[in-house]
């Protein structure tokens, strides 16, 4: 039997004062986090988020990966950027005042932390990668999927202080294996959503097209900005599924960009070019990444073998001594969506890389133990889960694809 709705009644309903009225702008909607999921757009996005999460576990479990829970509180900085939330119990007492003065003066030492809960510096994790690597050496193929935190004071549409990361690690795998896994994973998640959330994707795509038309008609910049918030994404999703991803090295990418600039095919931000001109050794900016994916190849692009200067110490050094076995996947409509690498399994090279990047060798002694007591070639990647949901839904602001976004000042 199929149930049919004949009568619907709501209680305590006062439509005159409901703040999430039709046509409300996303910026205003974010002021009502507890109510915004009742709107059609946000409920579509959250159903897509659910499907992406389910597809993630299904993809890895079907391929024999083991799910590992990595710690939320950690002592190591995986990214080496230092933008971490510190965890301490010292601020509730008189010792806390002394601790804060020492912290501001840069004079904290081991004796200070002896009074703290963990007896040493502790932070909210920025990545589970280093921890999940320990299990790849025992369980072979593993992945972690959990919350991560960045104390990066960036109040933009691309950054969150709390977000979720998917980080698989494959034993006996090189960078090519890693790239194939990442491509298969992206295609799997998108295909799953296309199959199971077709109505949601089509609804969001139609809404985005209407907003794009309204932006085009707006007479001033303020009006265009008010109509923003969504991008028609259906064509980009179909491009991902259409065929193999384009592959190129970082050097080839730079050469292509320089050639197209010289030939007058593209012009990049003059202010950025003045500060940091396009050249070999420059970390690709978002405008470079999107140009390659959207204009040159019109499909996702896997860029490999980046200069070692702006990549992490754990990435395997190439024979040229200048580049590392790193990769980024650049997707049309969003730019970088996945970053990964083959890990450095040679102990002497790893220890030197830690020193070269002015990291504390003692902090990573346990990580070096993974090589010291036997290891295998392995690789992995990281994907910001909210970036994936953004890509599937077409939402332009990352704060609109997570139930309760955390960002500076929120």
Residue ranges with predicted function:
Residues 1-410:
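Class II aminoacyl-tRNA synthetase catalytic cores and aaRS-like
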